[in-house]
Amino acid sequence: MESVSLSEAQIESSRGFRTDDERLRSIADKVFAKQRLDFEDGLTLYGSSDILAVGWLANWVRESLHGDITYFNVNRHINPTNVCVAACRLCAFGRKKDDVGAYTMALEEAWTAAATGYHEAVTEFHIVGGLHPDLPLEYFLDLVRGLKERFPKVHIKAFTMVEVSFLARRAKISIPEVLVKLKDAGVDSMPGGGAEIFSDRVRHIICDHKIDGGEWLETARAAHKLGLRSNATMLYGHVENDEDRVDHMLRLREVQDDTGGFQTFIPLAFHPDNTPLQHLPRTTGLTDLRQIAVGRLLLDNFAHIKAYWQMMTAGIAQVALRFGADDIDGTVIEEKIYHDAGASTPQGMRRSDLIRLIREAGREPFERDTLYRPVIRTEDSFTVAV
């Protein structure tokens, strides 16, 4: 990234940076000059003992981009099935077809579920599920068509790169062909799940039956080429190391340079409960905050960094708004995947509660749609300012 001039306010605020870590001072010089950080810089950010200085730098970038604005949305999760052939060691959600607790929603059931929950008009359906060995592509196309017919104003963010790849193999057509069919059915954008960590070594341990990192990235490229924006995630806090994390983010950054199709980066803390990796400890609050900060500093071409309150608790998410995050996600009505892995956060939060959390953190709430456009609410409906 080329150096660009700073505003007087940015120059003045940069003078507040303090640290005894000489390596961080060198990184700060690059950040203030808006020069791109490299792999070694990423390792330095992870290794520095001065986490407050790392957070300060990330917050400086965040406020340079967004000021005090913090984005949130009113969204509902729909998980049509938990039947999955992948058997990932990181997952507590997936089941085999005959397992106790396995389910697959009938289409009418899924459409009905979309209308239940809090009595607030949702602006987004977030749809992800397992890799079901028997469900045809047409099931998912009909699911989306039915939602669009019943809720034409609601943005449908559906199906991870992993799911799209699996559907392509089952239907014996190409990934771009599946994406075109999904888009024609009514999919508006895609979530960022399934990325985990791109390292082959790590994936062999935690998700060896899932597509590799290269295919995940190429599927994202194909989606972006068709005009489908997506998010990007990184699952951390299991068997990966700092090098794996930095490599993951730089590979995302490279694709973003080419496509510009990623909307936000979402670091996801691993929840080990009820998984084959439950012997591993959970991440600490400091680890979560550092990850938010490093993501903000390395991913200079991502507009948004999300502190997903369901994963890190509402309290840590509030602090993360001072460590580089500008988005706290949404109401997340009926989240299942992380709660099966032991998440103790509520399975949803009211719009008013999100607004309160953001204001208590000293930030300004901004209700957005999935594409980060402002949402204007009436008593029981909404419009999007285009």
Task: Identify the meaning behind each predicted range.
Residues T70-R76, F125, I156-T160, M190-G192, ...:
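Hydrophobic faces of well-ordered beta-strands that scaffold small-molecule active sites
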Residues R95-T233, H238-E254:
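Conserved Radical SAM active-site core
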Residues G42-Y46, N75-I78, G129-P133, Y236-V239, ...:
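Conserved short loop/turn motifs at secondary-structure junctions
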Residues S49-N73:
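Active-site-flanking structural segment that lines cofactor/substrate pockets
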Residues M1-L52, L65, Y118, L250, ...:
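Auxiliary Fe-S-binding modules of radical SAM enzymes
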Residues S64-H66, T70-E109:
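Canonical Radical SAM [4Fe-4S] cluster-binding loop centered on the CxxxCxxC motif
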Residues K34, A58, C88, I127, ...:
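Conserved, mostly hydrophobic/aromatic
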Residues F39-G42, N75-H77, R95-G101, V128-E138, ...:
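Glycine-rich, proline-tolerant flexible connector loops at the mouths of alpha/beta enzymes
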